[in-house]
Amino acid sequence: MILKSFLLGNLLSLCMKIINSVVVVGLYYGFLTTFSVGPSYLFLLRARVMEEGTEKEVSATTGFITGQLMMFISIYYAPLHLALGRPHTITVLVLPYLLFHFFWKNHKHFFDYGSTTRNSMRNLSIQCVFLNNLIFQLFNHFILPSSTLARLVNIYMFRCNNKMLFVTSSFVGWLIGHILFMKWVGLVLFWIRQNNSIRSNVLIRSNKYLVSELRNSMARIFRILLFITCVYYLGRIPSPIVTKKLKETSETEEGGESEEETDVEIETTSETRGTQKEQEGSTEEDPSLCSEEKEDPDKIDETEEIRVNGKEKTKDEFHKHRPVYENSYLDGKKKIENWELGILKEDKDLFWFEKPLLTLLFDYKRWNRPLRYIKNDRFENAVRNEMSQYFFHTCPSDGKQIISFTYPPSLSTFLEMIQKKMSLCTTKPEPEDLYNNWIYINDQKINLNNEFINRIEALDRGSLAMDILEKRTRLCNDENEQEYLLEMYDPLLNGPYRGTIKKCNSRSIKDDSITPTEDSIKRIWINNIYGILSTDYREFEHKIDLFDRESLSTDIGHSLTLIIGHSLPAISKFAGESEPSLNFKRLALLAEQRRIDSENKEKCLQLLSEENTTHPNDQTIRNQSIGIEEIGKRVPRWSYKLTDDFEEQEEEDEEESTEDHEIRSRKAKRVVIYTDNDENTDTDTSTKDTTNSDRAEEVALIRYSQQSDFRRNLIKGSMRAQRRKTVTWEMFQANVHSPLFLNRIDRTSPFFSFDFDIAQIMKPLLRNWMENEPEFKTSDSEEKEAKEEEKQKKEKQEADERIFIAEIWDTIIFAQAIRGSMLVTQSILRKYIVLPSLIIAKNIGRMLLFQFPEWYEDLKGWNKEMHIKCTYNGVQLSETEFPKDWLTDGIQIKILFPFCLKPWRRSKLKLRSHHEDPLTLKKKGKKENFCFLTIWGMETELPFGSPRKQPSFFEPISKELEKIIRKVKRKFFLVLRVFKERTKWFLKLSKEKAKWVVLFIKRILKEFEKVNPISLFGLMKVHEPSEKGKDCIISNKIAHESPIQIRSMDWTNYSLTEQKMKDLANRITTIRNQIEKITKEKKKRFLTPDINISPNEIGCDDKRSESQKHIWQISKRRSAKLIRNWPYLMKSFIERIYIDIFLCTINIPIINAQLLLESTKKIIDKYIYNDETNQEGIDETNLNIIHFISTIKKSLSNTNISNKNLQIYCDLSSLSQAYVFYKLSKIKVINLYRLGSALQYHETYLFLKDRIKDYCGTQGIFDSESRHKKPQNSGMNEWKNWLRGHYQYKLSQTKWSRLVPRKWRNRVNQRRMIPNKDSKKWNSYEKEKDQLIHYDKKNDSAVDSLPSQKEKFKKHSRYDLLSHKYIIYEDGKDSSIYGSLLQVNRNQEIPYNYKTHKPKPFYVPGGIAISDYLGEEYIIDIDTDQNPDRKYFDWGILRFCFRKNNINIEPWTDMDSGTNNYQITDKKDLFSLTIHQEINPSTSNSNQKKNFFDWMGMNEEMLSRPISNLEPWFFPEFVLLSDAYKVNPRTIPIKLLLFNFHENENIQNENISENKNINGNKKKDFRISSNQKEYLDQNHEEKELLGQEDCGSDPRNQQKYIEEDYTGSDIKKRRSRKKKLSKSNEEVELDFFLKRYLFFQLRWDYSLDQRIINNIKIYCLLLRLINPNEIAISSIQKGEMFLDVMAIQKDLAFTELRKKGIFIIEPLRLSIKWDGPFYMYQTVGISLVHKSKHQINRRYREKRYVDQNHFNRSTAQHGKILVNGDENHYDLLFPEKIPSTRRRKEMRILISFNSGNGNVVNRNPVFLNGNNVRNCSQFFDEDKHFDTNKFMKFKFFLWPNYRLEDLACMNRYWFDTNNGSRFSMLRIHMYPRFIIS
């Protein structure tokens, strides 16, 4: 066995080695390369197909293989690659060759003249075949690139060490694949030639001639194919000669300004080339080569070019033009930037012919690939994406050479530069020597440390200093004078002084320096050191830290000494070229020989350390201090800034620019809807101010083409061949999508219609298969919903069709002009020819029929019809004015009040039926009020819609005729009716007589029956079962008996007539058929045990069967009853157990228990679900568990459940202690202090676990002290307090409502539907879906078991909700969960019998979102006409509504419960945009429970539709973040994100008014508790504090911020331009917001959006009308124009719009290249708490009242955000502070955080000394018994080693990331201190 396993293991390892070997992998990839067939194969196939002889075939194959071999070699041999890859070589060689090839006629055999039979290799045509195949194989990679090839070549490159072996093996693999391919081709051709069926000569007689013709034209076919291929590729790649030259920011725009800007700006606008490859001029044609060339040192030797501004200059050129560039060399700070940007004045004077020819023809910086230009609209250029994120280099570590991926790029760069310019004479030590050296140095360090420690210990013991200090022998000059040599040159002195220099004044270091002359120093260093070190490494930015120049000079001096000492030969070589007169013999190293004067030394240093900058304005020379330049990595950027057409239009508005835009954006047309000329400024209603501009302002809408946008922001002139593979599955989609994310996209698109249609088809089939009729009838609401869905689908389909037609018109050339002219023609025809002629004809006809003519009415209607010209998408302009460019852009003609010809005008009233609904009439009227004209003269509802049905002219006439005929008939047939009645009477008489006869016969038969007793069986009644009887037979199983007995009779015994026999036989057959039918149905049906329908009549006298049936029925009833009552039995059983245990365990009197239970009555009420089970259409299977507390409550307080039919599903596993105490922890402490005695008992309980008891104690849930003291509700545990400060965790109800799909939410709502919709105050304290033990009883029907992908969303949302609920449950009673709805309490007071504190009616902590408090304990009156099932409110609109003081809420509400106008005071805090107010409980009148939330009854239309489709909630980028931004964005350092101009000027006044208000409240309310008073005071203080802290309250500060943050040059230009115009504050503000933060898109809510657009369409028309009253009134009546939207005043500031909810800030996905710091910031961001949250945290933590004066003293401490009071400790992020949310982990973590000792959790009393206010110490469990410093160090050291498991399990969405790969916590090696200034 051992041997076998050993052999097997060896075999496996051998196989693995073989598979992973370079040769095998090379073969594999080479074989794969075969499949990327390119155009080069055309020549190879041509040689085979044409049958030109084996020689040509051989030469073609040889050329093909040679070309491929060259390609493989060129991948690894840089010179060959550069030669092939340069754009100009390819262009120069390829274009002439292609032309020659295509226009060389094949039948003129140019190359055959030299052919001899001796040697066919001399035949030029064969050589040409070889050349063709060779060259096209090269084209296959460079000119006709295939992305597959490029990627395949790159795959294995970094892993293989032996590169040539890999190249060889991959070539061999390619060869094998190629041979196989050619064999296959040969077989196919042979089969074609041999197969007779191919050349069937049924119809073609001259078959031979056809084949020969085909063979002759084959060459032409191949040439055409090749030509098409090349044209296809070359059409997509820009021609290098006519490449669109993109404007660089550096050349023109930056010119004069950039030197004024700060360092930051120059860095950001600079263009950095990513790799040396690009600097060498190779194009980005082939991405497969970038990576390899970075490593290749040979490539650097190819050329010595240095690019300045795109011009290639060799080294000699630089020496020639040295005076021109001298300044840039001296520029210490900007030298690299100047090399990149080329901001050189002299450039502009150079003539064009001085530029090299190649640079003119080929712009190496052009966008050859379809790289997407990622815009960053603030100030940066386009990002290049060729740079790696890490920098790899070898470095010694622990004595060994290892590859480091975090190597400092500066070191590597410096080394490379030095090695490039001068060969270092040092030899590399062997690895063993390195390792030994490292060990030796380590030993030395240890010895030194030990020696130092020993000496210190000796000092501590009190030994003499002279004995302890080290004694050294020194070298001195003179014995008598005791003058020593300097330490640096003392050979006897070793140790710390040896080889180091003391930093002191430069004048004192005369002896340390070297002694060349001033001239030579200057020339060497200026001309050569810069030449060595300043090669253009553009991928590094320079961060400059200023240092003291004095101390710096000594360092530089010493480094000069060292460098010159080591590299004299190299310097002499380079210096000799430029300065031959320099004498190097004068240089010496010994200080005694020659010394330079200190002033000369200073000058030398000054040349290095100072830069002489020519100021662009005054041309003066100024000195700037140099800094140590730390070379750091930066994002590589392109050198130009590209604009799209929208930006171009913006620039055109601001200044006339001749430049064309470079980025292709979506097809759009600018539709001008209104032109504001100077003369009609009075009627101007546009939102723009009319400035004194020369040209008229145009109001325009942008109309996007509905086609899919495949231009994808491509740059003009870039290549399209290698776009990402994209698919489209919709007729029109805005952007292309990758198929990877199909599962994330809403499945309503046509692409997915197939599988969904299948589901729709399957549902009814399944239902029919399972049961004939459904078990429960669907409710009306479901039917309505289904109809609505159908209607919406139909509308969507119609809309798609309309869009499709519109796009067809838009794409065909000249189609718009044709259509427009046809429309205008049809309009003229209709208005002036067709309708007048119809009116004339009608009235003449009326006169001929002796009716009154209706000239007046008809002409009035005809005059009223208006034909209004509209833009292509339907914006109305006017009757006479045509849209601008309507022949190209398109036109619509809208007919207002379309005239409809009727036979008579008074028929309208007659035709209207009495039962017709006025609403439907209104709708009809709306529809008929306008229409659009089609090109055929028809009417349609919407542009491009289907023509609507015209009301027929003759229909009313026919109806009228029918009425007349009916009347005639009525009179004519009256006689017949009388006749019919007579005949009826006669028949009735005869029937009665017949009855008497029948009865008489029956009586005789009865007498006869008495004679024959057996006939009892014969005349038994057999009833035909009715519908109910059928059901009875199903359930009672008795139906089998009677037919059997009937069937077993002996019919011959009876003397009955033949007729009766037939009747009985018929009855038997019918019964038998019914039985069979019923048994079949039984097999199909699901039995329903509780259907209990009694039969009409039992058709049998058998007593035994009857008793059996009776027993069966009784047992069935009993079992149903048992099933129904089982939960009650279980519940009572559990009650008993729990009551006994509770009463035994908690040793307090029963009275106390009763008090406890009564005091918790309010909380428990919520879990009692008083609803009936048999509500129609509601699936009751998902009812939740009733908590055991409610069972105790029922047994002790004798309360009855109001409805006995309630079904309860109970599960014992749910009632664990952890769960019980989890539930108890939600109850306010205030009500639970009586449990204190249980928790105060410090010994072990039989029942209560110590851990849970400790947890409750530390949480402050139970107060162990007496009930008369103040409860500890205000104190909180530290970790929870910390979490409370982060907006990520305070998710509002709106968010939870969006978590899961709408269908599922509807199901929840249905289940919670309130039965009594008519009662005004109905109880909505429904049972809450419990997340810890959620038993979702799935519906058993097969329909609902269809797989749904949305289950995952539900699961995620449950975890999120559980964590959210667990973290913030102390905000109120129960925060919003899962499906928890707006809870509306019945209008009654909750009893407080035992002097407990009543909760205040409105208690909202400042700065916490008000939407968190919805649905907790506040009472809402909702009007009864509104839909009571609508439980979700979208706060996106209402969020900013109440910003002004004294807003009267009453106009918003439409209530019948009385008017209460509350005065709302609101703080205008810059960051916290939440509602903050106090409503006095005693001031309201009899309706005192009617609360602030009344205004939620407003405007249902606005609220009913959610803002956007948020099903994939887990993409934070796509979600409407109004919830995140409505409160201050605490973890986002960009403070200016939501700045408002002039918004906070009156903040002090407001604070004063608020103070007055609060004091007023105090005076009015005589019943304010101490709690309330404390809250009011704290509230007041917080407001003052925020008012003082508010940095945005001063407009000057804001101006300063703006000027600091505007750094981009183009933005600066715009700003300078803006200064010329005097703009209003609002415009400045809007410009500022939009221009600076363009990655936020502003949009408004959909319903509002639609209404505003409708209004705009009407305005456009009204503005042009002379008398607009009639149209305006009719449009308001039709509901086209909305008055509430019109109420917006003229010049609205953006802030006002945002406050009113008209604009919503919706962040777009930032186009920024994420890097390490961003991920670190994402991860650690939640630890950064903004200062405005400190007071909330403090308010929750503190226990005592604090005087206001101390606050005023302590506000200065809030300047630093994360610094503690004493400013010594910094708050660090400890992941163990964040609790994990899966399963029961929260308990374990809590217990490990808070030990059982109650003293550890400190409530942090605030010290009354103002200097020591603890403003941000919430991360540590601080205590007076605990040393915080040690604790901090301990945690800092320890935490990475544990809690990682919990960290990994944490819900990753809490970190604001959208996939797990960004969870980069483990990348961070060290956690620095975080301070946000």
From Swiss-Prot:
Q: Which residue stretches does the UniProt record annotate as biased composition, category Acidic residues?
A: 251-268, 281-304, 645-659
- The main location is plastid
Q: Which InterPro entries match?
A: TIC214
Give TM regions: 18-38, 64-84, 87-107, 124-144, 172-192, 221-241
Q: Where is the composition biased (Basic and acidic residues)?
A: 685-695
Give the membrane topology, semicolon-separated if more than one.
Multi-pass membrane protein
> Mind telling me which GO cellular component terms the entry cites?
chloroplast inner membrane
Spans annotated as Disordered: 246-313, 644-695, 774-795
What subcellular locations does the record give?
Answer: Plastid, Chloroplast inner membrane
Which keywords describe this protein according to UniProt? Chloroplast, Membrane, Plastid, Plastid inner membrane, Protein transport, Transmembrane, Transmembrane helix, Transport
Question: What processes does the entry annotate via GO biological process terms?
Answer: protein transport
PANTHER family associated with the record: PROTEIN TIC 214, PROTEIN TIC 214-RELATED
Q: What else is known?
A: There is a partial copy of the N-terminus (positions 1-454) of ycf1 in the inverted repeat (ABQ43318).
Q: Which family does it belong to?
A: Belongs to the TIC214 family.
Its biological purpose is as follows:
Involved in protein precursor import into chloroplasts. May be part of an intermediate translocation complex acting as a protein-conducting channel at the inner envelope.
Oligomer and partners: Part of the Tic complex.
The protein's name in its UniProt record: Protein TIC 214
Tell me what gene encodes this. TIC214
